[in-house]
Design a protein with these regions (language model features):
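Short coil/turn connectors between adjacent alpha-helices in alpha-solenoid helical repeat scaffolds
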Residues: 29-42, 76-90, 123-137, 171-185, ...
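Conserved alpha-helical positions within TPR/SEL1-like repeat arrays
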Residues: 16-33, 62-77, 109-124, 157-167, ...
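Alpha-helical adaptor scaffolds
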Residues: 124, 128, 132-138, 143-157
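Tetratricopeptide repeat
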Residues: 1-5, 24-25, 44-51, 70-74, ...
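Intrinsically disordered, low-complexity segments enriched in Gly and acidic/Ser/Thr residues
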Residues: 130, 149-158, 163, 170-178
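C-terminal non-catalytic interaction modules
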Residues: 167, 171, 183-226
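Short, charged, amphipathic alpha-helical segments
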Residues: 21, 39-46, 65-68, 86-93, ...
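Flexible helix-coil transition and linker loops at the boundaries of alpha-helical arrays
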Residues: 2-17, 34, 50-64, 81, ...
Length: 226
């Protein structure tokens, strides 16, 4: 990927050059995740950030969204490797930017990945900081999204918001160690999402919701709050 990117002139072939450079960044991020090499992950983040900066959104909105999501994932990997709250916050921004473009592509698997990544990074940021206010804000945002999207009009977006809301409930369980109804609320949201994904025949989305249901199933039952 590096050789291909180096062999392309970004001035004359900006999109091809951006795609090759982004692929290199994605490979570096995944290699760094497997090896635990933080320097390699940082190199991936820098590479992808440069690509995103150089490629205009209007040139190819879908490619721009893919690269924003790729940068989000690289930052997410960096956050996990370093327990860095700031990396997760930056990843959320990237996923949100990607989501703005992908909102009109309900069947695109990347949309599910970006939406799920955003929720995961919000939750991880809150878990690292222990700041329940972050979760409160995220929960409110997802509830507003649910209020604005009707299941019958835009079922996929509605179901994705349900999955994200469930992830926030999970994070609250992890942080507080108490169940004040979050487990049941998460299960209810995930089941609603699963029903939609199954009806729409969206396998990749269904797997995300099933994984979340499995996490709830095996999670140790926290003590009840008072």
């Amino acid at each position: 990927a590096a050789d291909v990117a180096d062999g392309l002139d970004g001035a004359y072939e900006p999109l091809a050059h951006a795609r090759a450079a982004a692929l290199r960044g994605q490979i570096l991020a995944l290699m760094g995740e497997v090896s635990g090499d933080i320097e390699q992950i940082l190199e991936a983040v820098t590479c992808l950030a440069d690509v995103v900066e150089d490629l205009a959104r209007d040139h190819s909105p879908l490619d721009w969204a893919r690269m924003q999501a790729a940068l989000g994932l690289a930052l997410q990997i960096l956050g996990e490797a370093t327990a860095g709250e700031r990396a997760f916050e930056q990843a959320v921004t990237c996923y949100e930017r990607a989501g703005l473009v992908l909102a009109d592509a309900p069947a695109l698997a990347l949309r599910a990945e970006a939406s799920n990544g955003r929720a995961l990074c919000l939750a991880r940021s809150a878990e690292l900081s222990g700041d329940l206010a972050v979760l409160d804000a995220a929960e409110a945002a997802f509830k507003i999204e649910l209020a604005h999207r009707r299941a019958g009009v835009d079922p996929v977006s509605w179901a994705l918001a349900q999955v994200n809301l469930a992830r926030i409930y999970e994070a609250r369980l992890d942080i507080t160690g108490k169940d004040r109804g979050e487990r049941a609320s998460a299960a209810l949201a995930l089941q609603a999402a699963l029903d939609v994904f199954a009806e729409e025949g969206l396998r990749s989305f269904t797997l995300i919701a099933i994984d979340a249901m499995e996490r709830l199933r095996v999670r140790a039952v926290p003590r009840d709050g008072v």
